């Protein structure tokens, strides 16, 4: 096992060196390059499970990044961390900010729907059907948008929309 870890570590380092070289050669402003470096470091930390470091790097990237699509991607990754940590309200708020930057992110809508649907199920299990329906309707609303942005990409969601009678889309493909 140690040799595999050494090999992976070598590949990570090699990739980092190559990526840094590419970033240096990119014909973009220094500020944008630094934003990308922070984003890349945040993404690496997130993949390694170091969410605190990831969030710090993403915050620094957002201070420098001006491109709305890139800002949206950074915010989406931050929301994923909040969701993983169980901070659903902060995740929802951050997904919304990501969508304000780039409204064509179906994964943000999908994840928001997961939170809404989870809340609906919890209320339903406690016998609060009227309250649960509010959350299920919210899930249906964002999931319908996600399905329209990514037809055929979320078959489980399409099935949920159809089986719950909340489908407002006749044809998904």
UniProtKB/Swiss-Prot annotation:
Any Gene Ontology CC annotation: plasma membrane-derived thylakoid membrane
InterPro entries registered for this protein in UniProt: PSI_Ycf3_assembly, TPR-like_helical_dom_sf, TPR_rpt, Ycf3/AcsC/BcsC/TPR_MFPF
Pfam family, one: TPR_12
One biological process term in Gene Ontology: photosynthesis
Keywords: Membrane, Photosynthesis, Repeat, Thylakoid, TPR repeat
Chief localisation class: membrane
The UniProt record lists the keyword Protein biosynthesis: no
Topology of this chain in the membrane: Peripheral membrane protein
Localisation per UniProt entry: Cellular thylakoid membrane
PANTHER family per the UniProt record, alphabetical: CELLULOSE SYNTHASE OPERON PROTEIN C (PTHR44943), TPR REPEAT-CONTAINING PROTEIN MJ0263 (PTHR44943:SF8)
Protein family: Belongs to the Ycf3 family.
Function summary: Essential for the assembly of the photosystem I (PSI) complex. May act as a chaperone-like factor to guide the assembly of the PSI subunits.
Name of the protein described by the UniProt record: Photosystem I assembly protein Ycf3
Organism: Prochlorococcus marinus (strain SARG / CCMP1375 / SS120)
